[in-house]
Swiss-Prot record:
Gene: cysS
InterPro entries: Cys-tRNA-ligase (IPR015803), Cys-tRNA-synt_Ia_DALR (IPR015273), Cys-tRNA/MSH_ligase (IPR024909), CysS_C (IPR056411), Rossmann-like_a/b/a_fold (IPR014729), tRNA-synt_1_cat_dom (IPR032678), tRNAsynth_Ia_anticodon-bd (IPR009080)
Record motif 'KMSKS' region, residues: 266-270
Entry-linked SUPFAM superfamilies: Anticodon-binding domain of a subclass of class I aminoacyl-tRNA synthetases, Nucleotidylyl transferase
Alphabetical UniProt keywords: Aminoacyl-tRNA synthetase, ATP-binding, Cytoplasm, Ligase, Metal-binding, Nucleotide-binding, Protein biosynthesis, Zinc
This protein's name: Cysteine--tRNA ligase
Positions with a binding annotation for Zn(2+): 28, 209, 234, 238
Species lineage: Bacteria, Pseudomonadati, Pseudomonadota, Betaproteobacteria, Nitrosomonadales
Cofactor annotation: Zn(2+)
SMART domains: DALR_2 (SM00840)
Compartments where located: Cytoplasm
Source organism of the structure: Nitrosomonas europaea (strain ATCC 19718 / CIP 103999 / KCTC 2705 / NBRC 14298)
GO molecular function, one term: ATP binding
GO biological process, one term: cysteinyl-tRNA aminoacylation
UniProt keyword Cytoplasm, yes or no: yes
């Protein structure tokens, strides 16, 4: 039985989909004005892991992850760069897709862009105006009137007074209440705009997700996810919009992943500890980054540091070494086992962990227990199950030898794969000629470069430290 921690009720709840056998899920994606950072990577990997597990349980998953391609930050960056905002967003959408692919993230069922659904947003704003939940300000902006929605604050667990006192809200003399948020922004020079009943303008950020989720998933769906930073105001405002239009709850389970910190400090450009995914991937294999993310529970803070990434790399290397050592033969890979979820003790433990609010740290612990058993017994069946269960988390699917030969850190001065293979052949020839001094010299040169040779009756293999 799958249980999910629901942010709205602040409790673990048994997961019961609205439609048997089907899960409809929406996750807030990127605002594309820059490269993905580690916080984005966590959202991508966390909800990819959720989708994978739901599919493993046999559900058909309709997964929508939007792209915000019109926003104040996008417009500001495009003006700074002296380029069309559409060119800017196209570039960073491509970069985001490349980063997601590198991290092993499965493409969502749908990836709508906000600019393609402006008509739906206008229709939703009209419905809110008709229900007197919104108003047109004197400057042409349209605002949501939070005092007209009695449930405002229920996701964040705060009253209107608490929110006014404790949250930073934009001061705008056109608002009736400081917490009122914009649904439609009147056009300004040099900004993209669309025709509307209130004049030319563009949608506010919050209405975008309400409109796109309804377009693909209807007025009620199973799971809405995103980063913890979106809980207020973004998701709070989505509730006000969608429930305001339809008069009922539109999401059954709210999921939020925790923050990413760097060396126990908040990640920010001002502190000089802001890292993009691309920067991290110049130093670590993509699978190491994915493994680092899934080793932590999705709701816990994730602390990025070189020490933690190096530890993740070493741990993943141990698992791949087990797969390499217990392949049926030197030249073949471990076959992926068919998982017996009912009768295999390791599979049952793995399922129990994942059904407990997607407890990936406990699931990873099962992988290491399997690895230990494979080493203890030498039985390749354990390695096969290790690979199969790892695949559920999007891990351990590379050929082991290929993974182990990947450079630990990408830097100048390292031997290429071709150079390493040539030196191994030179060493082999030296040994045939009984020139053991030359063979030892070649081994030492490779060892100094972080290349470990492993001799066996089947030949010599190598890996990087």
């Amino acid at each position: 039985m799958l249980k999910i921690y629901d942010t709205l009720t602040r409790s673990r709840r048994e997961f019961i989909p609205l439609t048997p056998g089907e899960v409809r899920m929406y996750v807030c994606g990127m605002t594309v004005y820059d490269y993905c950072h580690l916080g984005h990577a966590r959202v991508l990997v966390v909800f990819d892991s959720v989708v994978r597990w739901l599919q493993t349980l046999g559900y058909k998953v309709i997964y929508v992850r939007n792209i915000t391609d019109v926003d104040d930050k996008i417009i500001r960056r495009a003006l700074e760069n002296h380029e069309p905002f559409s060119a800017l967003t196209a570039r960073y959408i491509q970069a985001m897709e490349e980063d997601a692919m590198a991290l092993g993230v499965i493409s969502p069922s749908f990836e709508p862009r906000a600019t393609e659904y402006v008509d739906s947003m206008i229709a939703m704003i009209e419905s809110l105006l008709n229900r007197e939940l919104a108003y047109v300000a004197s400057n042409g902006d349209v605002f949501y009137d939070v005092r007209r929605f009695p449930g405002y604050g229920k996701l964040s667990g705060k009253s209107l007074d608490d929110l006014r006192a404790g949250e930073r809200v934009e001061i705008d003399t056109n608002k009736r209440d400081p917490l009122d948020f914009v649904l439609w922004k009147a056009a300004k020079p040099d900004e993209p705009s669309w025709d509307s009943p209130w004049g030319k303008g563009r949608p506010g950020w919050h209405i975008e997700c309400s409109a796109m989720s309804e377009h693909y998933l209807g007025d009620q769906f199973d799971i809405h996810g995103g980063g913890q930073d979106l809980q207020f105001p973004h998701h709070e405002n989505e509730i006000a919009q969608s429930e305001g239009v339809h008069g009922h709850s539109h999401v059954n389970y709210w999921m939020h992943n925790g923050f990413v910190r760097v060396d126990n400090e908040k990640m920010s450009k001002s502190l000089g500890n802001f890292f993009t995914v691309r920067e991290v991937l110049t130093r670590y294999q993509p699978e190491v980054v994915r493994f680092f993310i899934v080793r932590a529970h999705y709701r816990s803070p994730l602390n990025y540091s070189d020490a933690h990434l190096n530890d993740a790399r070493s741990a993943l290397e141990r698992l791949y070494t087990v797969l390499k050592n217990h392949a049926p033969s030197q030249d073949s890979e471990v076959a992926t086992a068919v998982i017996d979820w009912e009768n295999n003790v390791y599979a049952r433990r793995f399922m129990s962990a994942m059904n407990d609010d997607f407890n990936t740290p406990e699931a990873v612990a099962v992988l290491f227990d399997l690895a230990s058993e494979a080493n203890r017994t030498g039985d390749s069946h354990y390695a096969s199950l290790l690979k199969a269960l790892g695949g559920v988390l999007g891990l351990l699917q590379q050929p082991p030898q290929q993974y182990l030969q990947y450079p630990a850190h990408l830097q100048d001065g390292q031997y290429s794969v071709e150079e390493i293979e040539n030196m191994i052949q030179q060493r082999l020839q030296a040994r045939k000629e009984r020139n053991f001094a030359q063979a030892d010299t070649l081994r030492q040169q490779l060892a100094e470069a972080g290349i470990i040779l492993e001799d066996s009756p089947q030949g010599t293999t190598w890996r990087r430290e």
